[in-house]
Amino acid sequence: MSSVKRLDINYKTDELFEDFRNFGNKDLYLVDELRGEMIDASSDSPFYGIYVGDCLGARMALYRKGEVEETHFPGFDDYNVIWKLEVLRDFQGRGYGTSLLDFAKDQGLPIKVIARNQSKDFFIKQGFTDLEETNRDGHDVLVWTP
């Protein structure tokens, strides 16, 4: 299993995210999220990643209920939200996305996820249930329960 690391909120992390901006999906950039967190330096980092050598090959933003969009998730008092999860193309198919999800599942809380970039089948394969709803941007909403 790959080692998931919490990413610091600083300009070095912004530099590490550069490869994702250059080669990744524009819906998953995390630019606004990172810069917003840098403004509030007192907050804990919601960003996690997997390094492959010196390269950040995979990353996710894992938030607690109330920190991001709360719609489409009735019936849960406390939960986490995987706001965005991305593995660079050169590192796909190596289990890094699954490792990030396993890390989130190990928190022991239900997880809500917005399936962007045709990732719905991946999340279903990982045990998520399709709520058969979409968010305001038209992305599918899925949930995992412990």
UniProtKB/Swiss-Prot annotation:
Its EC number is 2.3.1.-. Disulfide bonds: none annotated. Residues 7-146 form the N-acetyltransferase domain. Pfam families: Acetyltransf_7. GO terms for molecular function: acyltransferase activity, transferring groups other than amino-acyl groups. Keywords: Acyltransferase, Transferase. This is Uncharacterized N-acetyltransferase SSP1595. It comes from Staphylococcus saprophyticus subsp. saprophyticus (strain ATCC 15305 / DSM 20229 / NCIMB 8711 / NCTC 7292 / S-41).
